[in-house]
UniProtKB/Swiss-Prot annotation:
The lineage of its organism: Bacteria, Bacillati, Bacillota, Clostridia, Eubacteriales. Signal peptide: none annotated. PROSITE patterns: GLYCOPROTEASE. This is tRNA N6-adenosine threonylcarbamoyltransferase. PANTHER family: TRNA N6-ADENOSINE THREONYLCARBAMOYLTRANSFERASE, TRNA N6-ADENOSINE THREONYLCARBAMOYLTRANSFERASE, MITOCHONDRIAL. Its cofactor is Fe(2+).
Length: 341
């Protein structure tokens, strides 16, 4: 395709209101994010109704800023991309309705994007020459998957969590040891001061040796039990040791399973995606495992790991090339599965 395709992308699945302009799925002209983290920190987590109200306040502003920063107008835009699931239904609806209104008023194609596919596509922005097939570990507050990306927009799910997502476990453990919200970055930071071998927390292993699923409820419960026992004994809890030991348990399982996935599918490339992909200990462990097994390990920049609209613009471009235009009846689907249309 000789003509550059400019996508205006919108993301509002949780607590970030974001808009971006992306060219040909890989070049970001703008990536504007209005974060609500300071608001939700007061509540110890995301409050859905508050998130929705803040999206309504911010969405028009971030879209305007994204266009200005990219030095383009609506006339320059070829299609509107928007996250329509999974996520918080009220939050998703704000972005979907806004995108539908723009698409209708401007007579532009509307592209519905799966939020998880967006996270995976962040790697296409970071690595301009990256092409499928590859294995991707998607690890965030709400999702933990191992995916084989066979082609653009074509996925096999090789493994997923059977209970808590990894990021969810991080948040709950952080709250239990008094670190507050958001838990992931705080555990990552305090772990640098702790001994990761101080406490042995369990790692979920399933009977089927080829099983690539995860379970993080056990290690989360083990941490809570450890804290309760220490409190009953009136003994001081070393938060850094607890955080480091918990983190090691989670990271070890993530690394082991994704390396196993590459070997099972005979793939020599791993892309990491999602908010937890910013975790410095996960990055270090994945890089070391990749070197040991002669597998390339790819990470997006931290700004592309957390929720943003540039990744949605990338995914929307590849959907656009396949002719997957959404009807104006597009609705938010909070439990949307990867690969569903």
């Amino acid at each position: 395709m000789s003509k550059d395709i400019k996508i205006l992308a919108i993301e509002s699945s949780c607590d970030e209101t974001a808009a971006a302009v992306v060219v040909n799925g890989r070049d970001v002209l703008s990536n504007v994010i209005a974060s609500q983290i300071d608001i939700h920190t007061k509540f110890g987590g995301v409050v859905p109704e508050v998130a929705s109200r803040k999206h309504i306040e911010a969405i028009g502003i971030v879209v305007k800023e994204a266009l200005e920063e990219a030095n383009v107008t609506f006339d320059d835009i070829d299609a509107i991309g928007v996250t329509y699931g999974p996520g918080l239904v009220g939050a998703l609806l704000v972005g979907v309705q806004y995108a539908k209104s723009l698409a209708y008023a401007l007579k532009k194609p509307l592209i519905g994007v799966n939020h998880i596919e967006g996270h995976i596509s962040a790697n296409f922005i970071q690595y301009k020459d990256l092409k499928p097939p590859f294995v991707c570990l998607v690890v965030s507050g709400g999702h933990t998957f191992i995916v084989h990306m066979k082609d653009y927009g074509e996925f096999d799910i090789l493994g997923e969590t059977r209970d808590d997502a990894a990021g969810e476990a991080f948040d709950k453990v952080a709250r239990a040891i008094g670190l507050g919200y958001p838990g992931g970055p705080k555990i990552d930071k305090i772990s640098n001061e702790g001994n990761e071998n101080a406490i042995v927390f369990p790692k979920a292993n399933f009977h089927d040796k080829d099983c690539l699923d995860f379970s993080f409820s056990g290690v989360k419960s083990a941490v809570l039990n450890y804290i309760n026992k220490m409190n009953m004994k009136n003994e001081e809890i070393n938060r850094a040791d607890v955080a480091a030991s918990f983190q090691k348990s989670v990271v070890d399982v993530l690394v082991d399973n994704v390396i196993k996935a590459c070997k099972l599918r005979n793939v020599d490339k791993i892309a990491i995606a999602g908010g937890v992909a910013s975790n410095t200990h996960l990055r270090e462990a994945m890089i070391n495992a990749g070197k040991k097994n002669k597998i390339d390990v790819l990470f997006p920049a931290p700004i592309l790991c957390t929720d943003n609209a540039a990744m949605i613009g990338s995914a929307a471009y590849f959907e656009y090339l396949k002719g997957r235009v959404a009807p104006l009846e597009l609705n938010a689907i909070p439990n949307l599965k990867l690969g569903e249309r």
